[in-house]
Amino acid sequence: MSGTPRTMPPLMMDWAEQPNGRAKPRGMVISRVPYLPWYLLGAVRVGGVSNARPNSRPYSAEQADFGRISQTALCRYRSMPVRNPTPYGVGTQVWRAVVLHHLPLTAAMAAAPFISLLQGDQFLADTPIPGSAVIPNSGNLFPKWADKLSPTAVETWLFDAMAEDGSAAFTVSFFRDGSQAPASFRAAINAAWSDGTVWSQHLVVPVSVVTSDGPDVGHGHVAGVWRTEEPQSNDTTRTTASFDVAADLSTTTVVFDAPGRITGSLTHRSLGYPTLPQSDREAEVAPGAYWFRPIAMANATVDLTFHIDDPTNPDKKTEKRMVLGPEQGAFGGMDRSWLPMVWGKEATDALFVRAQAGPYVMAVMRLVSKPHKYYQNTVNAALYRDGKIVSNALRSLPPDRRDTAATADAVRTEKLYDGDGLVAKYRDKNVGYRLEFRSAGPEREKWSFDLRHHQAWWAKPTSRPGPDGTGNSGFVVEVTGGLVGSEESVHGWGMTGEVELSD
């Protein structure tokens, strides 16, 4: 982000709306005012006033350049009617705007017509509220709860990268999580190296802002920033994590500036695999819960520096870099998810996969519901061969389903307990997964891949310790398999996120 942040008191400004609809500035005075609830949000010029009428859409306020422009910023402000508007003539409405907060932005973000800023103690709705609808043929990157976050909702923007040989892997998920308020905004980061080093931290911050430059909320360049309040450039406690996605979904850039923790960037250049949903159903991972891949596969470039705690000296840290690019055949992608309720409330098991083996790319998000929903398997998955989709699996088959009949593309997921692979730390003690993709096409083709745990990545408990303790685990996995009934045998690498929850 550019611009020099500065602290300033709230601003009070008046403007008059005459019967002909023209806005006439009355001038502005800088004064300290008590905090007021706000219901207007927009990009304005500090030192000027907005033409936006009260109750207009929060992220579509027009801008007006009245007076000296002192700082381009994103502002919170409240508009209220001013009594005695007589000096402006009969029929004139006079409104007062009180700027309560400003957040410096890049020029591009300040000019964006669609802005979602959540921060402070006013961002959470009092009761659960619905998110906005799926937009067909869109990455749906603008927040679904743009103005107020539902207290039960979670929105996620996920970016990852991996070396072609599995020697290094990285993932970050940007969360807006109403269930974790007031710590709702975090970037969950995990990294792994072939020497066994792992790094897992959450950057928890008080501010989350996402902008889109249009022409509507479903299309356009999107930028997101998770950050501390107005950090100074020399402030070693500052934390900023940001993402930037091109309007055509061709590129992404993720940047970290958290001194003493993580700095650097991840970039993607999409390979153009077909991914975008054309309907609600194509975006769903379960009824009413959405998870899909705006970028299913991309060339990735990583240049990150991590600060790792010394277990023998809490005051000492060592630096470790991760550098991946074309030389390492680095690949990755981007996932987008939003759920009206934390999926852990409804699910007992989850599996995330992104992997590459020979000409195949596979991407999976699969949930298993809790007993009151009969352990139903639901999924949003895709198998690509040479960049073309061969199984768009929106149907999840139970592990014991072994027949070949298929009326729709589907995937069967089965936990592996025998053979090579690291044993998972928590309840199920599996050594990997078998993915069996099916096509409903004329040939009724079937592909089977074994994903075996090669390196443990992250491991976080989701229950109390014990023999049946559950957890959230990540693995670098070795992939083998191919087309069933043929001599094809491919090899590759991938990553899995495996979550177990109590019933």
UniProtKB/Swiss-Prot annotation:
Keywords on record: Isomerase
Pfam family, one: DA_N
InterPro entries: DA_C
Lineage: superkingdom: Eukaryota
Coiled-coil residue windows: none
Gene Ontology molecular function: isomerase activity
EC id: 5.5.1.-
Pathway(s) where this gene product acts: Secondary metabolite biosynthesis
Role this protein plays: Diels-Alderase; part of the gene cluster that mediates the biosynthesis of the tetramic acid Sch210972, a potential anti-HIV fungal natural product that contains a decalin core. The PKS module of cghG together with the enoylreductase cghC catalyze the formation of the polyketide unit which is then conjugated to 4-hydroxyl-4-methyl glutamate (HMG) by the condensation domain of the cghG NRPS module.
Protein name: Diels-Alderase cghA
